[in-house]
């Protein structure tokens, strides 16, 4: 609930900006491809957002120590999809390089119901898996391995989304 409050505060302050696709001179807002508005979470952020980032950083360090994952950094942002918006099929390897290793999505949507839409469609070897964006659900998957789509929802869809990196980050 505290993280949802931090999201609401950023939204009320007008800090969520339309997300772009592409890189360099090809970078552009393309609502037909990606329909979310985002606000980056920084290590220096205080309150629930900073605490959430700190907790995931602790998980990164534990994974490195116990599983030798070699994860170097973490980046996260709040994401808001307005009703009817989604994100076309893609994988999370950055155009700048393949340093994204694990993708993370933490959902903030209270009282989500079947029929609200907004599912994450994750493509697996056994076929697509639909994951409803219900509050307090954390989804993690290999960034370069799994193509995925955010299906349009009939109501606002909120999450914290990010990546563990290997390399420069």
Task: Report residues per predicted region.
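Fe(II)/2-oxoglutarate oxygenase catalytic core
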Residues: 1-103, 107-138, 144-169
């Amino acid at each position: 609930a505290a993280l949802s409050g931090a999201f609401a505060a950023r939204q009320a302050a007008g800090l969520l900006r339309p997300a772009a696709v592409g890189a360099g001179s090809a970078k552009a807002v393309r609502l037909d491809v990606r329909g979310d508005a985002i606000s980056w979470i920084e290590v220096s952020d205080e309150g629930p957002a900073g605490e959430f980032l700190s907790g995931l950083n602790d998980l990164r360090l534990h994974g490195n120590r116990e599983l030798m994952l070699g994860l170097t950094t973490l980046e996260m942002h709040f994401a808001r999809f307005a009703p009817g918006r989604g994100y076309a099929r893609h994988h999370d390897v950055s155009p700048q390089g393949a340093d994204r290793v694990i993708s993370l999505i933490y959902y903030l949507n209270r009282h989500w119901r079947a029929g609200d839409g907004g599912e994450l469609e994750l493509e697996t070897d056994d076929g697509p898996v639909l994951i409803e964006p219900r509050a307090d659900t954390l989804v993690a998957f290999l960034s370069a391995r799994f193509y995925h789509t955010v299906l349009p929802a009939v109501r606002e869809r909120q999450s914290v989304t990010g990546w563990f990196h290997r390399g420069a980050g």
